[in-house]
């Protein structure tokens, strides 16, 4: 199995549809916990915690639990994380946690992996 599994195609060619199909298959044929999320939602979730007046450890822990307590993390349109520096660091930590715990990561992008820094 490939981990992470990187899906690359130009916009409008079915990456999101493919990710939904993969996620639905995993949920239907196993007891694995699957989380499908767009990078925009990941960014919004993180920014709302950082900017919250209730910015405390328990909210950050809840955020991390949501994204790290899964068997399969599917994140669509990862290219949007490129300009979100603080969120990139949080995503990298989430990625590393999942990877080190042998959890599956599936990423989709309209940018080739060779174009990432």
Set out the residue ranges of the language-model regions.
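Walker A/P-loop nucleotide-binding motif
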Residues: 2-20
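P-loop NTPase Walker A phosphate-binding motif
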Residues: 17-30
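Conserved catalytic network of the ASCE P-loop NTPase/AAA+ motor domain
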Residues: 27-30, 65-68, 72-73, 96-104
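Short glycine-rich substrate-engagement loop in P-loop NTPases that contacts/grips substrate
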Residues: 31-70
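Structural recognition of the conserved hydrophobic beta-strand(s) that form the central parallel beta-sheet
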Residues: 36-37, 74-76, 104-110
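Catalytic P-loop NTPase motifs of RecA-like helicase/translocase cores
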Residues: 43, 80-82, 114-116
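Short regulatory helix/loop adjacent to the ATP-binding pocket of P-loop NTPases
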Residues: 50-51, 113-117
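Conserved catalytic/switch belt of AAA+ P-loop NTPases
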Residues: 82-111
